[in-house]
Amino acid sequence: MSKVIGITGGIATGKSTVSELLTAYGFKIVDADIASREAVKKGSKGLEQVKEIFGEEAIDENGEMNRQYVGEIVFNHPDLREALNEIVHPIVREIMEQEKNNYLEHGYHVIMDIPLLYENELQDTVDEVWVVYTSESIQIDRLMERNNLSLEDAKARVYSQISIDKKSRMADHVIDNLGDKLELKQNLQKLLEEEGYIQSESE
């Protein structure tokens, strides 16, 4: 029977890498970040609603959403973040639901890659939750390098979410990503073997 698994974690814990690895095992990925971009793509109703709230500056010269401009505003103004979420979230849910149902109809196991799964209380929409774990210090280091952020800004992003330790305690399974990509792959393979998704290579 097909399963729906929610993959989550904290910012820069390695969720996307885990999703990428899972595709090699035949899982189908429904990515909340991709759906979010689809929800406000050029010419969409969602983008038009964003412009109504955030003004012309919210649209760049290519007719796309100016993510940096909108991101800076909502990071510092919770009321506007809530307004943006009210526009985007229903559209994202509809896109993801359609993708998920399409994969389930064809008998695939589905991974719902949702960074804010616990923050948005979506754990009941999946059969299991797998959390990708790394330490907060590694999260901060990765963010500083990947996004070219200051230490202060990186910490602010990490601490704006439910802590990775708390998410790990709530999860059905935790995937350790404290090491390199090879170790992550080995940890993921072990979980898939234990849960019966793949056969052990020793069998």
UniProtKB/Swiss-Prot annotation:
InterPro entries: Depp_CoAkinase, P-loop_NTPase
Pfam family, one: CoaE
Location of the protein in the cell: Cytoplasm
Entry's Gene Ontology BP terms: coenzyme A biosynthetic process
GO cellular component entries: cytoplasm
Organism domain of life: Bacteria
Binding locations of ATP: 12-17
Keyword entries, A-Z: ATP-binding, Coenzyme A biosynthesis, Cytoplasm, Kinase, Nucleotide-binding, Transferase
Pathway(s) served: Cofactor biosynthesis; coenzyme A biosynthesis; CoA from (R)-pantothenate: step 5/5
Any GO MF annotation of the entry: ATP binding
EC number(s) reported in the record: 2.7.1.24
Reactions catalysed, as given in the entry: 3'-dephospho-CoA + ATP = ADP + CoA + H(+)
Sequence ranges assigned to domain DPCK in this UniProt record: 4-203
PANTHER family per record: BIFUNCTIONAL COENZYME A SYNTHASE-RELATED, DEPHOSPHO-COA KINASE-RELATED
Function: Catalyzes the phosphorylation of the 3'-hydroxyl group of dephosphocoenzyme A to form coenzyme A.
Alphabetized HAMAP family for the sequence: Dephospho_CoA_kinase (MF_00376)
Family statement drawn from the similarity comment of this UniProt entry: Belongs to the CoaE family.
UniProt protein name: Dephospho-CoA kinase
